[in-house]
Amino acid sequence: MAKGKFERTKPHVNVGTIGHVDHGKTTLTAAITTVLTKKFGGEAKAYDQIDAAPEEKARGITINTAHVEYETANRHYAHVDCPGHADYVKNMITGAAQMDGAILVCSAADGPMPQTREHILLARQVGVPYIIVFLNKCDSVDDAELLELVEMEVRELLSKYDFPGDDTPIVKGSAKLALEGDTGELGEVAIMSLADALDTYIPTPERAVDGAFLMPVEDVFSISGRGTVVTGRVERGIVKVGEEIEIVGIKPTVKTTCTGVEMFRKLLDQGQAGDNVGILLRGTKREDVERGQVLAKPGSITPHTHFTAEVYVLSKDEGGRHTPFFNNYRPQFYFRTTDVTGSIELPKDKEMVMPGDNVSITVKLIAPIAMEEGLRFAIREGGRTVGAGVVAKILD
C-alpha cells in the first residue's frame, strides 16, 4: 500500500494506552490502527511491530516506547504504547511522550489490578488530564452482572484519584476480535465507539503558540550601545517588540521590556514557540539575568521552592546510583537549563528509595524556580543524572 501524504488539516492530539500487564494494551493499539486504517486511511500496525518497541533516550533514561499514528473523522492522533510496566513509569514521569489523554485498558475478566491502580495514580500525579476506559476481553465474560461490577470498580478507582469516574466514557469490547476483523458489537464497532470517545471526550489541546509567553534563559550577553540580550528557545506563546515581560526565578521577580527580537542575526518583530531567539531587554544589566531564570508574560508564572513530586530513580544498569538514598538526601534538581540544590523528604512509610523505584517525595529547593504543576526535572549528582521527576503539587 502506498504511503499517504501527511496532511496537517486535522487537529493533532497525543494519546497512549495505560493499564495492567496482559490486559491487552498492545493488542488494542494494533486493533485501533487496523480498524481506523480501513475507515480513514493510514497505515495499520501488526501486534509484533508494536511490541518490538525501539529504545529511546529521554533525559538520559532509556525507555522502550512504540509510536503509532492514526486518523479519525475529526483528528490525527499520535499514540504511544510501552511494552513493560517500568517503561510506563519512566515515560509518564519524564514526559517523553506527553499525553493529552490516556486510554486505560482493563480486562473485564480480571477487573482492576495493581498496575491499573498505579497507572491511574501516575496519570493523576504527572497531569494526564483525561482518561477513557476500554473494558477489554468482554467476549470472555458471559455474565452481564459481572461486567457491570467491573465497570463500577473501575469508576470508583478513577474517582478515588480525582478523575470524574461517573462521567468517564467506558467502551466495552474485545481488541482481539476487532483485530481479527469481527464486525460485531465487541469487535470493530467497539473500536469505532472508542474513536468517537477520543474525539468527543478529549478536548483539542492548546497549541504551544497560544500559551502565555515563556522562554528559559540559556545565555546572557551584553552588546555595547544596545543593552542586554538573552538567548533561548521560546517554549510557548509569542513575544512582541515593545511588550512588558518578567524575569522569574532564582532572584526576586523583575519587570522589563522587550526592545528587540533577533533570529539568525535578523531582526524580527516577534518570536514564537519553537523559535531560538535573542531577546533584547531595556534597562536590564547583564548581571540581573542568569541561566535558569525564565522570561515570561507578567503574572503567568511564579517562583517556588517547596513542592511534591513523583520521581523515578535510575537503576544501576541505567547509570544511576548503586545504593539507596534516605530522608533528607540533597541532590541537585535540574530545571530547564540549570541545577538547584534541594533536600528530599520521603513519605512516612518509606525508609529509603532503591535504584529503579518510583516514589512520591516532597522537595525544598535552596533557590526559587519558575514553576507550575506538570513541570519536568532531572535529579543529578555531580552532573550525572540519577533520576527524573515531575512537579505534582506546589506547596508554598
Curated annotation (Swiss-Prot):
GO molecular-function terms, A-Z: GTP binding; GTPase activity; guanosine tetraphosphate binding; translation elongation factor activity
Record field: catalytic activity: GTP + H2O = GDP + phosphate + H(+)
Region of interest (G3), ranges: 81-84
GO cellular component, one term: cytosol
Cited Pfam families: GTP_EFTU, GTP_EFTU_D2, GTP_EFTU_D3
Record region (G1): 19-26
Main location as per UniProt: cytoplasm
Chain spans, region G4: 136-139
Residues covered by region (G5): 174-176
Positions of disulphide bridges: none
Binding-site positions, GTP: 19-26, 81-85, 136-139
Nucleotide-binding recorded as keyword: yes
SUPFAM superfamilies: EF-Tu/eEF-1alpha/eIF2-gamma C-terminal domain, P-loop containing nucleoside triphosphate hydrolases, Translation proteins
Annotated function: GTP hydrolase that promotes the GTP-dependent binding of aminoacyl-tRNA to the A-site of ribosomes during protein biosynthesis.
UniProt subunit comment: Monomer.
PANTHER family: ELONGATION FACTOR TU, MITOCHONDRIAL, ELONGATION FACTOR TU-RELATED
Descriptive protein name: Elongation factor Tu
Species of provenance: Burkholderia cepacia
Gene: tuf
